[in-house]
Each structure stands twice: as C-alpha cells, then as structure tokens.
Amino acid sequence: MIIAVSGKGGVGKTAFTTLLIKALSKKTNSILVVDADPDSNLPETLGVEVEKTVGDIREELKKLVERDEIPAGMTKLDYLRSKIFEILVETKYYDLLVMGRPEGSGCYCSVNNWLRQIIDNLAKDYEFVVIDTEAGLEHLSRRTTQNVDVMIVITDASKRGLGTAKRIKKLANELEVKFKDIYVVANKVKPEYEELIDNYAKELGLNLIGKLPYNKEIAEYDLKGIPLWNLPENNEVYKKVEEIAEKIINKKF
C-alpha cells in the first residue's frame, strides 16, 4: 500500500507522517519511507542521520557524464541503481530514502525518468510505502506523486484549511491523478470545535478520517529538538494516529 501525506507548510504534516510510520512499524518492518519534501525535517523527527540524498546522486551523475567518467562496464542506469541502494538508510523499523533538492534546470529528463523507475521498482519490495510530499500543491501539478493508494491531506483546524484540502482534492481530479482514497486529517483541534470541523468537512464533501488535538508533549519535543519517534505510545495524539492507521489498513472508513 502506498500512502502519500500532503498539506501546506506548518500544519503538522511531517509530525503526522512520523507518527504514522511509528504506528505502521508495530505491524511490520516492511516499510519504505520516501522524504519527497526538500524543506522537510523528516529525518530529524525520525531520529536518523542522512548523509546523501537522491538529489546529490543526480548531481554527481551529471558531473560524471560531463567529464566522461562513468565507471567502466556500467551504464548510467546501473550507476544510479547502485547509488540509490547505497544511500538507502536501513533501520530496524523501516528504510528511508530522502529525495533532497528538486530537479534543477538543465538536468536530464532521462535521468529523472530512470530515478522514478528505480524507486517504483524498489517500492514493490515493501508492504507499505509512506511518502512525505512537498507542502502545497506543487507535487500534484508536476505529477511527481504517482500510483498512490491513499492520499492523506493534513490541515489545520479552520474552514480555510479545509478549503485547501478541498482544492488539493479538486486539483487531483483535474490532473487525473489516481488515488484509491483521499482522506483529510484536521490537526490541533480544540474539543469545543470538533463538531464545527465535522460540519465544515461534510459541507465541503471531504472524508475527514481523524481529528488530532493540540498536544503539549509534542510541542515540547519540537521546541527541544527531540525526535517525535521517541514519543511514548500512551500519548493521546499518537493513539489517535494509530486509530487512523487502522482505519486505512482495514478500510473501516
């Protein structure tokens, strides 16, 4: 199952992604995490260090091609494939691939196509693939999120935020991006506003799969730079993310 997590910057997208990965890791360690947001701090929230990104490999290949220094007996595709496996961060709970800098001007279309092909093939070896996408709508307009089973849009607890989720859903339909399901998660919802959020979501035709409360413990972790991966399992928000994961896996929504 391929799950993409989207949302505007600052709504808690990466925090949700981290807790979702933690919840899924209780069921299996066959998880590929793809950090496709160049502005994301997903490795930090997961508590892992990343030495190289896919963007770094792309730039290295461009320089090798310009200098005609591709290793003997290797095609450019072979080189890319070997390097992708080298930079894959393997942990006990999941494997992580960080995309890094976006495709710059003047880079080779064939290289980018090869990269997508390699990553698509790699993804087939995992039970779950979780993609932390770019903030906003860019990944949809460029069609960089492909073959996704579930898109989860994270929004803040406001009518404007839910309106953004509605636009993401509309853009996906216009671009004919195929998702089996699109769900919305409202973040930092005050208890007294839960019913209002439910009504707004219904009014906009959104599948609101969960509402997460503001959480002091998460705010403290963020402030102190503690990886959210270390959040205790009895944390209220983590337990709600576990419930969301169950709904998605078991199609109980």
Swiss-Prot record:
Binding site for ATP: 7-14
Entry-linked SUPFAM superfamilies: P-loop containing nucleoside triphosphate hydrolases (SSF52540)
Molecular function GO labels: ATP binding; ATP hydrolysis activity
InterPro entries: CobQ/CobB/MinD/ParA_Nub-bd_dom, CooC, P-loop_NTPase, ParA/MinD_ATPase
Zinc-finger is among the record's keywords: no
Top-level taxon of origin: Archaea
Keywords: ATP-binding, Nucleotide-binding
GO cellular component: cytoplasmic side of plasma membrane; cytosol
Pfam family for this entry, one: CbiA
Cysteine disulfide links: none
Family, similarity comment: To M.jannaschii MJ0084 and MJ0823.
Protein's UniProt name: Uncharacterized ATP-binding protein MJ0685
Gene source species: Methanocaldococcus jannaschii (strain ATCC 43067 / DSM 2661 / JAL-1 / JCM 10045 / NBRC 100440) (Methanococcus jannaschii)
